[in-house]
Amino acid sequence: MTVLIHVLGSDIPHHNHTVLRFFNDTLAATSEHAREFMVAGEDNGFTESCPALSLRFYGSKKALAQAVIAKAKANRRQRFFFHGQFNTSLWLALLSGGIKPAQFYWHIWGADLYEVSHGLKFRLFYPLRRIAQGRVGGVFATRGDLSYFARQHPGVRGELLYFPTRMDPSLNAMAKERQRAGKLTILVGNSGDRSNQHIAALRAVYQQFGDTVNVVVPMGYPANNQAYIDEVRQAGLALFSAENLQILSEKMEFDTYLALLRQCDLGYFIFARQQGIGTLCLLIQADIPCVLNRDNPFWQDMAEQHLPVLFTTDDLNEQVVREAQRQLASVDKSGITFFSPNYLQPWHNALRIAAGEAE
């Protein structure tokens, strides 16, 4: 039997760390198809912290792609599970036959599904990528992303699967300990990545609430982002008084970030695609409602779980936010499909499907 190989094809340390730790701690002990990884980027201590996994690291996305293609050609029974945002060479290999459809299973993280960049090289590449995506053996994704993908590629198998957000189920009831009143605190974006469209989001928050709320913008990730942070700070201070604007430029440990989220009353996410599911889960767990772009299909997942959804086009005020908080507080968090531990069984199913052991 040929063991499934997992591919992290882009050097995205935060996401790669989450996936590797999840597989090491949760899946590797029960499935031989959860142990082999090819990773773009440096080791960064992963080998030591994930002893249950067999990890191979590659210095560039191109080097990783060449290694994957070589393995695919050498053994056509070899199957690969591609996680999230990977690279151009892998899509082109699928398009050219270097990797066959039956070898290619893809967990959609969002960015590789949507065509949001206006750069010329991206606009030229998107049609090729779209054709290639129609040739994958199967996809795994959120409900909203499955719906989006199926409209373009109705013949490709799709299965529900959620990114393994680090969550402590014992915290599901913790939010009820806090009494929410007074000035609203609004979280804008889930990281310092430009895809959060921070400046547009700050303007939207100001248009809805004016300079009457506390605004928190976490921008400690990714690194080497100071010029953009300064740009966002300048734009924010043109709208909000200094005491109402908090731009966080330092990377935070998980527990610190969790404590920050739990001080918020509302999350505001203007991006028009599915991303930041980890932050959304942690906010929902704390009874903090989220404002989404109507073009972000994750609202379908939230609605399916009977969670209140606010949109950027809604008329928002404190009363609307407090009512959404009340509705969230009445939801039994233990039944939410994309919460831990409920997302575990779909992962076991996904491994069997990608490995060819399940119909």
UniProtKB/Swiss-Prot annotation:
A Pfam family hit: Glyco_transf_56
Catalytic activity: beta-D-ManNAcA-(1->4)-alpha-D-GlcNAc-di-trans,octa-cis-undecaprenyl diphosphate + dTDP-4-acetamido-4,6-dideoxy-alpha-D-galactose = alpha-D-FucNAc4-(1->4)-beta-D-ManNAcA-(1->4)-D-GlcNAc-undecaprenyl diphosphate + dTDP + H(+)
Enzyme class (EC, first level): transferase
Subcellular location: Cell inner membrane
Top-level division of the source organism's lineage: Bacteria
Keyword terms: Cell inner membrane, Cell membrane, Glycosyltransferase, Membrane, Transferase
EC number per UniProt: 2.4.1.325
Record pathway: Bacterial outer membrane biogenesis; enterobacterial common antigen biosynthesis
GO CC annotation terms, alphabetical: plasma membrane
Biological process terms in GO annotation: enterobacterial common antigen biosynthetic process; fucosylation
Topology class, membrane: Peripheral membrane protein
GO molecular function, one term: fucosyltransferase activity
Family: Belongs to the glycosyltransferase 56 family.
Physiological role: Catalyzes the synthesis of Und-PP-GlcNAc-ManNAcA-Fuc4NAc (Lipid III), the third lipid-linked intermediate involved in ECA synthesis.
Protein name per the record: TDP-N-acetylfucosamine:lipid II N-acetylfucosaminyltransferase
Organism whose genome encodes this protein: Salmonella paratyphi B (strain ATCC BAA-1250 / SPB7)
